[in-house]
Amino acid sequence: MNLKLLKTVCFKEILENIRDRRTVMSSIVMGALFGPILMVIILNVTINMQQDKAEQQLSVAVVNQEGAQNLMRFLVSQDVDLVTLEGSPEDAIKNKSHDVVLAISDNYADKFSQGKPAKVLMYHDASAKGVAKVSVNRLRALINGYDRSIGMQRLQLRGVSPRLLQVVMIQEHDQATKESRGAMLLSVLPYFLIMGLFMGSMYLAIDTTAGEKERKSLEPLFLNPVPRDTILAGKLAATVAFGMLTLVLTLVAFKLTLPWYPFEKLGMGFNMGPKVMLIMLLVLAPLALLAGAIQTIIAAFAQSYREAQTYVGLVLIVPMIPSMLLMFMPIKEQLWMMAVPILGQNLVINELLRGDAVAWDAIALAFVGTLIVGLLLAWIAVKLYNREKMLFAD
Amino acid sequence: MISVQNISKTFGKVTAVENVSLEATDGKITALLGANGAGKTTSMRMIYALIKPESGQVLVDGINTHDSPVAARAKMGVLPDARGLYKRLTARENIVYFGRLQGMTEQAIKDRSEELIERLGMASFINRRTDGFSQGQRVKVAIARALIHDPQNILLDEPTNGLDVMSTRAIRRFLKDQRARGKCVLFSSHVMQEVSAVCDDIAIIDAGRIVAHGTEAKLLEKTGCDNLEDAFVALVGGEQNA
């Protein structure tokens, strides 16, 4: 293959596409910035909301306050805002006018004075998202506290040591590190990185193949004394270059947005040093080849730009699969998994996020495995254009 | 010198070209004349080695286009049916790109483009992006791009299609210049006046076959008509076939 001709084709495609502002905007800027910025915004908003709720005065709707005056006094002393509820507790939860409703049973006072368990009913929606849970948990903790303190007093009055009730004491040793807790939060990062490079190469893959076919410039191009596979290899090189550029920009964008992540508030940490970034780049780079080749193959079969966009757009789902899988299923990783494209990248990046030292054989396997599949697909893409059918849109 | 020997092509059940043979010699302009859908573009595509003939062969300066398409293409300059300029590149960038693909040196590309800009009258728009070019400007750029390497054999598919009088005359003048320089020019057309005005040899194609071949005078003599249009209609079997 003549490298000079390959470069000529590659540079022309790059020049042509850089002049197309829309392409540059959508593929590079969207691909690279969308993920990191979205992550920063979502994390900050949810954490601030939860924190606000935790620091705010807790407001509890109560039915039958008079039934448990001692408990009510305790809650007020704990700075709880008690509201008398009109209407049914079920409706109050259903129409979200209250996060939690406390109903005092009618025989509460009798049971209490007899030293039997006195019933209170707590209405809430366990499937409610986010901040409602904070109110429920705070109220439960307060009532549990009240329960314990009254219980201890009763035992002490009878001359029994409350410690007798403590049969087993659990001492927790959480082995999660700041980094591993951060990794949970950042588990979407590999997905955004992979997504970015797929988006970055998408428009070039379409423009240089289906686009060129639609504009009817493929025929004159193939009339030059250059083997078709050389031309296609040049186009693929330009496509992969855009994918790589987007990848590098995504990494840089992520690094630059790192200070805005609410790690401190969560007691989490993530150290993204140059070594971590380089390993990420290394394992993801062959994926750019794979992405460009797959997209070129698919775009080659399309008759028009629009058709190609539809098909290639569907391919964006592929990188989601391993990321989703890993998010919901804790897979015990095996070395061979590293060789599976996309899955290997996900595993390596997740380990990096956890602050673990990743073994070099895993990194090498992720790199080589993906590179082999990528080269194979690139070879198919390049050879496809030897078929006459691929040349004409008519 | 282009020698086409018994080429055929079918698409599914449709026979597009059947047993077409023709010779285009150096220093002459040869026309492939036929109605729309007669098989001109398919024949041309086989001649310039974009698609493979199912039988027969094409020799360009003695090189078999099927066996060595890359070498054969270096001997040809082709203006295909699809002009396909790159709209985001300037006219000059379009031309230079093809020069590089032809393997020319930067200096040779520069010299040759200046010559073509002069000959085709492209100076006023050479540095503009081709998006929004008129039909005539587009054809001129496409011709310059196709002929950047100064090939011995020039093939054009309907070169003056959709052009105004001034552009048409400019193209004709250019082709006559090329003939005078001893080039072999082969073009396809369905326009009688066009063919009549510039061609030395005419091959008439109808329904995928060559039905007549010769100079205009010979074709008129053969049919007993006094103009090419009548002769053409007579040769393709009358107007009921149209």
Q: Where are these predicted regions, by residue range?
A:
Chain B
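Catalytic Walker B motif of ABC-type/P-loop ATPase nucleotide-binding domains
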Residues: 154-158
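ABC ATPase "signature
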Residues: 213-214
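Conserved ABC transporter NBD signature motif
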Residues: 24, 56-67, 71-72
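Conserved ABC ATPase "signature" region
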Residues: 96, 100, 107-125
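Conserved ABC ATPase signature
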Residues: 88, 129-133
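Conserved catalytic motifs of ABC-family nucleotide-binding domains
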Residues: 150
